[in-house]
Regions:
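Flexible "arm" and connector segments at domain edges
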Residues: 2-96, 100-137
Length: 137
């Protein structure tokens, strides 16, 4: 009987330590995620470089970006009622955030200044004009 009380106490202590560690991990993650997205992406890319082969990391990131875009599309389809199961707007937001974060990390891994590339592309978009004339009033 005594053994079971000791076991229960040990399990509770282990659970408390795990919860405390998870809270500390979330706090550390929140600290790392603060600040401008390009700097956050640089930190994420640095972590990826620590854990993955530098020769395969670029292709892994390109494939991850394509995967995230697909997940965003699927989340939107579910929310819009175009899929067998339904989804929430929060899912759409979260998946789009994954696309943006993964795009920034991929750009960093590939040595692309995504902010500069996006500004240059926006300039092109605004100078090409709209393809369709506005509807008549």
């Amino acid at each position: 009987m005594m053994h079971s009380h000791v076991t229960i106490l040990a399990d509770r202590q282990m659970t408390a330590r795990r919860i405390t560690q998870q809270a500390a991990d979330r706090t550390a993650a929140a600290r790392l995620a603060r600040g401008p997205l390009p700097q956050t992406a640089a930190r994420l890319a640095a972590r990826l470089r620590e854990h993955f082969d530098p020769h395969t990391l670029p292709v892994q990131q390109v494939l991850a970006l394509a995967e995230e875009a697909g997940e965003f599309t699927a989340a939107y389809r579910r929310w819009a009622g175009l899929a067998r199961r339904s989804g929430t707007w929060h899912d759409v937001e979260a998946e789009l955030a994954d696309v943006v974060i993964t795009a920034y990390v991929t750009a960093h891994v590939l040595g692309i200044d995504l902010d500069a590339a996006a500004r240059a592309k926006a300039e092109v978009v605004f100078t090409r004009g709209w393809r369709e004339p506005p509807p008549a009033a």
